[in-house]
Structures are given as C-alpha cells and as structure tokens.
C-alpha cells in the first residue's frame, strides 16, 4: 500500500514491540520513517528534539510512542521520590509535548499533519502497574491530545490518541505477565472480551486508521484498543 507515499514520519520508542510495529506499518504505507529510541534521541530534551526534527527536514506524521515505566514498580505513594515521579512523567508526557511542539511549525506551513499519541488504558482507569506517575502521565497524554487537536485543527492537522490494553510487547510487559502466575493470567484474559492479549500489530492498525486521509475528520479522539477490556 502507498497511502503515505511522499510523507515523512517520525516514530519514537521503536526499539521493539509497539513502536517497531508502528514504524513497519508506516513503511508499508509508503512513508519515509525515522525511528528513534533512547539510544538515538533523548525525547525529554527539547533542544535535542528540535535539532533532530530540523535535520530530518520536516515531519508529516508523528507517533509519540516513547515512554513506559522506566524500570519502576508499584510502591506506596509516600515512598515515591520527586525524581522517580519526574522520570516517568518526562518519559511519557513531557516527551509527547516536546516532539509535538517541534513538528508543529512544519505541519502548519504545509497545511497537513497527523499526530498520534500512544497512551494506555492506565490513563483511563486504574493502572495495573500501580505506578502513580505512569497513570498520571498517560491521562495527561489524553488531555494533551484533546487540547492540541482543538488548537491545530484549523491548520489541517489532526491529533488523536490510542489507549492500548495489555500488550506483550517488550521485556517489561513480559515480566509483568509472568509475575501474575497462572491464576492471575487467567483472570486477566477472562476480563478481555475477545479472550486474548494484544499484539503490537493491533496497535499499529489503530495508528493506520488515524493517519489515513480518510480519517481527516477524526481528531481529538482516544481509541481504546484492548480487546474489549474497557467494557467490563
């Protein structure tokens, strides 16, 4: 398929899993894809992000996928340090703001743009991780999606969001899954309408919908892709 032929895309958090699947999908759609991860670009550093986008020469499609729990585990609120909080919020929410800010001038100039933020079911309900900063940052991404969609819509730019359910996509989610044990795993799958965990390609397919020309009248939305978990 060549629906994005001639377009340039930037995807953050592409080392594996969801980000890699999204980048692969965009390439099959004909886009020139720039893949970045923490080893190639610090997306919490505004100057570095601006420099990277300038060097790329313009971004038509931005997928803010970078983030995660940053090696943290759920702890009582009183045991969470300010540094712990900032690390997770910066990785998930601040990075989304910085990357969006960097690509906006070029999108405005060209009169076209697609921005998709990868949030989480943790941004819409209680997080399975138990990490307060993660739940807060993911909810913040949803709010940022609405606000920027309202601001950028007149310039031909749509901004949407995906809230994935439990996707086995990286070593962290694999460890989390294994920690549940057989009973916990059965309970989790039993709470998913289609009775299976998500795959990275499920999320990539949601991004495919949002970046398509046919979705030009869809903006400010958050799509839960969770196998029906949110309906329980």
Outline where the language-model segments fall.
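Conserved glycine-rich cofactor-binding loop
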Residues: 15-16
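Catalytic loop of short-chain dehydrogenase/reductase
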Residues: 68-69, 116-140, 145-154, 166
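Substrate-binding pocket helix/loop in short-chain dehydrogenase/reductase
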Residues: 73-77, 81-89, 184, 188
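A short, exposed helix-loop element centered on a Lys and neighboring polar residues
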Residues: 100-101, 146
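Short C-terminal tail/terminal secondary-structure segment
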Residues: 125, 207-208, 219-232
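Short, small/polar-rich loop/turn modules that mediate ligand/substrate recognition or access, typified
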Residues: 153, 158, 163, 218-220
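A glycine/serine/threonine-rich, flexible loop-to-helix segment
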Residues: 166-191
